[in-house]
Curated annotation (Swiss-Prot):
One of its GO terms (cellular component) is cytoplasm. This is Asparagine--tRNA ligase. It comes from Haemophilus ducreyi (strain 35000HP / ATCC 700724). It comes from the Bacteria. Its EC number is 6.1.1.22. PANTHER family: ASPARAGINE--TRNA LIGASE, MITOCHONDRIAL-RELATED, ASPARTYL/LYSYL-TRNA SYNTHETASE. One of its GO terms (biological process) is asparaginyl-tRNA aminoacylation. Belongs to the class-II aminoacyl-tRNA synthetase family. Transmembrane segments: none annotated.
Length: 467
């Protein structure tokens, strides 16, 4: 065992009673008793609970330092592990020596003083908010989910591929992209027609931050068979909502020789795997979310794991919604995309389980989705989860060059701009499929938090790029 065990290792019983250890962390609270003892709670971020430290008043620095400790001070405590007489923790630390490493300059103005803070306030001090119970728990759950995703895909024989963050292609064809440029905004070069001359820019052409790693991922799937990307993506969508970020992380598997049915199975297996992992590996944090954020959060994940996914064609889903007798805020009609209220009705009230809606009208989906034989729909799917609605979107990709070209032209895109993507269809084309999972949306679902800005360390949104 390390000379400096974590609080998690101590509280989980990996250190035996009587052993001398050194703990390094930060003070959460200090309480003094009339009997000449002080009690500190010290956390190091390794788990939800802090460890209680008992300090006798005969320590050399008791009067000069211990009695001045406040929330946020950093300490190194050496002492013996003893059984705790109080309920709550099996063991505590009897201090032999306490070294104060860092003081809080002015405890009265310390932004993280030991009291309950609103979530809105914590966003204003995002550099300090990981010190709170809430954001500390979110950070550990985020880590657990990320590790589980990598483990899942590795176990399924997928290779992780790093796709570029700077791109010249718009995967979604929506045009909501951040431009990357080194041109002088005060003195933009112009063509003879008065347009900005991007040939003089860093890349010699227009460049953007990526909205998805999918197209690049497809090129590797058509060589390695099974790949996935997991990295940041960017959308310049002027949406200041609880569900949108300008910078977020995406998980995007792509696999060759795969159909839409294979895609739906992969999505189901992955979600159940990662939910099982977080319930087993982060029990302490999940209990906190169930107690303070959303009492249904653990039950919801357990039900998700236990339930087989329902599947329904988009056309049938529209019929279900029309016949439901329910008044929706947004109208229901074939050819219209499902809104969040429609998705949640299907998952929560009709199927009462996760549901895969598939075969959407081609006019509301992207150019790369495989055209079905009816000529009206594409082999697209959305996974809808009770409690949130859409959590995954994916499709079988269009592997036929002529069909892909006509879809691009139909949608006002220039096939030549995607010459390299078209090459994949020219040289040994193969049916393939994939999906995208917004990682932060997954964390929102797991934690029960209402706002996506709480589940990423430093949220980026319209008019907000602090820190």
């Amino acid at each position: 065992m390390s000379k400096f065990p974590t609080v998690s290792e101590i509280l989980s019983g990996k250190i035996v009673v009587g052993e001398k250890v050194t703990v390094r962390g930060w003070v959460r609270t200090r309480r003094d008793s009339k009997a000449g003892l002080s009690f500190l709670t010290v956390y190091d971020g390794s788990c939800f609970e802090p460890i209680q430290v008992i300090i006798n008043n005969d320590l050399a620095n008791y009067q000069t330092e211990i009695l001045r400790l406040t929330a946020g001070c950093s300490v190194i405590v050496t002492g013996n592990i003893v059984e705790s007489p109080a309920s709550g923790q099996a063991v505590e630390l009897q201090a032999l020596e306490v070294e104060v490493v860092g003081w809080v300059d002015d405890p009265d103005t310390y932004p993280m003083a030991a009291k309950r803070h609103s979530i809105e306030y914590l966003r204003e001090v995002a550099h300090l908010r990981p010190r709170t119970n809430l954001i500390g728990a979110v950070a550990r759950v985020r880590h657990c989910l990320a590790q589980a995703i990598h483990r899942f895909f590795n176990g399924q024989g997928f290779y992780w591929v790093a796709t570029p963050l700077i791109t010249a292609s718009d995967t979604e064809g929506a045009g909501e992209m951040f431009r990357v440029s080194t041109l002088d905004l005060e003195n933009l070069p112009r063509t003879e027609h008065g347009k900005i001359d991007y040939s003089q820019d860093f890349f010699g052409k227009e460049a953007f931050l990526t909205v998805s790693g999918q197209l690049n991922g497809e090129s590797y799937a058509c060589a390695l068979s099974k790949v996935y990307t997991f990295g940041p993506t960017f959308r310049a969508e002027n949406s200041n909502t609880t569900r949108h970020l300008a910078e977020f992380w995406m998980v995007e598997p792509e696999f060759a020789f795969a159909t839409l049915a294979d895609n739906a199975k992969l999505a189901e297996d992955m979600l159940k795997y990662v939910f099982k992992a977080v319930l087993e590996e982060r029990k302490d944090d999940m209990q906190f979310f169930a107690k303070h954020i959303d009492k249904e959060v653990i039950t919801r994940l357990e039900n998700f794991i236990a339930a087989p996914f329902a599947q329904v064609d988009y056309s049938d889903a529209i019929e279900i919604l029309l016949k439901s007798g329910k008044k929706f805020e947004f109208p229901v009609a074939w050819g219209v995309d499902l809104s969040s209220e429609h998705e949640r009705f299907l998952a929560e009230e009709h199927f009462k389980s996760p549901v895969v809606v598939k075969n959407y009208p081609k006019d509301i989906k992207a150019f790369y989705m495989r055209l079905n034989d009816d000529g009206k729909t594409v082999a697209a799917m959305d996974v809808l989860a009770p409690g949130i609605g859409e959590i995954i979107g994916g499709s079988q990709r269009e592997e036929r060059l002529a069909v892909l070209d006509s879809r691009m032209i139909e949608m006002g895109l220039n096939p030549e701009d995607y010459w390299w993507y078209r090459d994949l269809r020219k040289y040994g084309t193969v049916p393939h499929a994939g999906f995208g999972l917004g990682f932060e949306r997954l964390i929102v679902y797991v934690t029960g938090l209402q706002n996506i800005r709480e589940v990423i360390p430093f949220p980026r949104a319209p008019r907000n790029a602090n820190f």
